[in-house]
Amino acid sequence: MRINPTTSSSAVSTLEEKNLGRIAQIIGPVLDVVFPPGKMPNIYNALVVKGRDTVGQQINVICEVQQLLGNNRVRAVAMSATDGLTRGMEVIDTGAALSVPVGGATLGRIFNVLGEPVDNLGPVDTRTTSPIHRSAPAFIQLDTKLSIFETGIKVVDLLAPYRRGGKIGLFGGAGVGKTVLIMELINNIAKAHGGVSVFGGVGERTREGNDLYMEMKESGVINEKNIAESKVALVYGQMNEPPGARMRVGLTALTMAEYFRDVNEQDVLLFIDNIFRFVQAGSEVSALLGRMPSAVGYQPTLSTEMGSLQERITSTKEGSITSIQAVYVPADDLTDPAPATTFAHLDATTVLSRGLAAKGIYPAVDPLDSTSTMLQPRIVGEEHYETAQKVKQTLQRYKELQDIIAILGLDELSEEDRLTVARARKIERFLSQPFFVAEVFTGSPGKYVGLAETIRGFQLILSGELDSLPEQAFYLVGNIDEATAKAMNLEGEKK
C-alpha cells in the first residue's frame, strides 16, 4: 500500500518538474499524448490533464495509458468526460497506476472509478490506497474448501446452490429481474453475513444505484448515524459515464474487496451489476484504440480482459471473496461472446427466463438451465441431491409433454403423466417466492426459507402427500406450511 500521488498537490508539483507531455490528438474518450524522448510513461500509468477550458472552467481529467505508439507518443483512455480539452494542453505523468482508497474508512461511502467520494459526506478518512491493477493470487495461496452459501431463496438453494468463496452469475435479458435478485441477495446475505460487502455498479441505471443506496440506509446495512458501523462500500460508474470509467469501475470495487480479504483477513461479498457493461465499455474503447474487432464486433482481447478481472476474485488462506455478478444477455442469446466468456469463470449460474417472468413466476429462475458445480452428493448430501434431481426430472417431463398438451389437451395423457403434470405445476409455483425488496410491488411480506425447510417442502410435493391441494396455494409463499395454510384459506373462501 502507498500514498496515491494524484491525491497530494505537493506530489503533483514534483511530478510536474519530472515528466510533462502534451495532447496531440483527441478522439472522444481517447487521447494521444506526446512525451519528451526517453520519458515515456508505462502502460496503465495514470496521466493528469490540468488546465482551463475556453470558458475559464477548471479542468482535471485523469487518463490511463493503454498503448505506446512509438515516436514518443502514448494513447490513453480518459476516466471522465473530455469536454473542453484542446490540443497542446499539458499532461502530467503520475508515474504510477490509478490508486483508490481502501480499508474500513470506505464502508458506508459511495465512490466513483477514481476512488473519489460522491456522496457529499466529505473526504475519506484514510491515507491507505491501493493500485487498481494487480496480479491474481498465486496458485499456492488459494483455498479450495467447498461449502454451501445459503441464500434463503428456494430455487437457488435447492437446484443451483452457491459456493462460499465462489463466483456466481445471474444471466438474463432486459427486464427479467437481475437487479431485483441481486438486491434481494444483498438483503438476505449482507444482513445475516458477518463480514463486509462491496457493490460495484458497472454501467447500470443511476436510478437503480440511488434506490439501492436509499434501501441500504433504511435496512441499516449503511448506518447514517455512525458511518463506521456500515457493512458495505459502494462504487458506481453508471450508464452516463465515459467508457473508460465503466471499463475500470469493476477493478476499483475489486481492489477495495481484495484489501478486506488480504489485509483485514475477512470474508467479503462482491456484487457486480452488470459485468456485461464492463465488456461493452471495453468494446467501445477497443475500436478507438485502433484494434480490429473480433466476433460480433467485440474486442479481440475479450477473454484476456475478463480473465484478468475474474482471476482476482478468489479465496485465499487469509479470507474469501464471494462474488455475485449480474450478466445482461443481449437479445436473450446465451451464445453471445460476452455471456459465453463469462460462463467459463463461474461456479454457479442462475439463468433468468422471460417465459417464467411472463407467467408471473418470480424470481424467474429457469430451474433446468441454471447450473452449479456444488450440486454433488459428496458436497450437499444425498437427501438434497436426490430431491433436486427428482424436481428437475419432473419439470423436464412436464416440458416434454407441453407440446402434446397444446395439441391434444390434458385429457389425452396417461394417468401417470397427468399426475406428473399436476406435481410439476405445483413445483413451478412453489419455486416462486415473495421478496423483501419487492414488498412495495407485490404487497406480500418477504420470506427467507432455510435449506432444510426447502428440501422438506419439495419432498412432500414429490411424494404425493399434497396432491389434493390446489396449485394456486403454492404460488408466492415461503415454506410448505404456508402453502397448506393458504390452501385451507382458499377452501374456506369457496364455502
Swiss-Prot record:
Question: PROSITE patterns in the record, alphabetically?
Answer: ATPASE_ALPHA_BETA (PS00152)
Q: Which GO terms describe its cellular component?
A: chloroplast thylakoid membrane; mitochondrion; proton-transporting ATP synthase complex
The record's annotation in SUPFAM superfamilies points to: C-terminal domain of alpha and beta subunits of F1 ATP synthase, N-terminal domain of alpha and beta subunits of F1 ATP synthase, P-loop containing nucleoside triphosphate hydrolases
Q: Name one GO biological process term.
A: proton motive force-driven mitochondrial ATP synthesis
The signal peptide here is none
- Compartments, record wording: Plastid, Chloroplast thylakoid membrane
Sorted alphabetically, which InterPro entries does this protein's record hold? Answer: AAA+_ATPase, ATP-synt_VA_C, ATP_synth_F1_bsu, ATPase_a/bsu_AS, ATPase_alpha/beta_chains, ATPase_F1/V1/A1_a/bsu_N, ATPase_F1/V1/A1_a/bsu_N_sf, ATPase_F1/V1/A1_a/bsu_nucl-bd
**EC number(s) per entry:** 7.1.2.2
Cross-referenced Pfam families: ATP-synt_ab (PF00006), ATP-synt_ab_N (PF02874), ATP-synt_VA_C (PF22919)
Provide the alphabetized UniProt keywords. Answer: ATP synthesis, ATP-binding, CF(1), Chloroplast, Hydrogen ion transport, Ion transport, Membrane, Nucleotide-binding, Plastid, Thylakoid, Translocase, Transport
- Catalysed reaction per UniProt? ATP + H2O + 4 H(+)(in) = ADP + phosphate + 5 H(+)(out)
Please report the record's description of how this protein sits within the membrane: Peripheral membrane protein
- Where ATP is bound, by residue? G172, G173, A174, G175, V176, G177, K178, T179
GO MF, one example: ATP binding
Q: What class of enzyme is it?
A: translocase
Name the HAMAP family for this protein.
Answer: ATP_synth_beta_bact
State the function annotated in the UniProt record: Produces ATP from ADP in the presence of a proton gradient across the membrane. The catalytic sites are hosted primarily by the beta subunits.
- Family statement drawn from the similarity comment of this UniProt entry: Belongs to the ATPase alpha/beta chains family.
Note the subunit structure. Answer: F-type ATPases have 2 components, CF(1) - the catalytic core - and CF(0) - the membrane proton channel. CF(1) has five subunits: alpha(3), beta(3), gamma(1), delta(1), epsilon(1). CF(0) has four main subunits: a(1), b(1), b'(1) and c(9-12).
This protein's name = ATP synthase subunit beta, chloroplastic
Q: Please name the taxonomic classification of the source.
A: Eukaryota, Viridiplantae, Streptophyta, Embryophyta, Tracheophyta
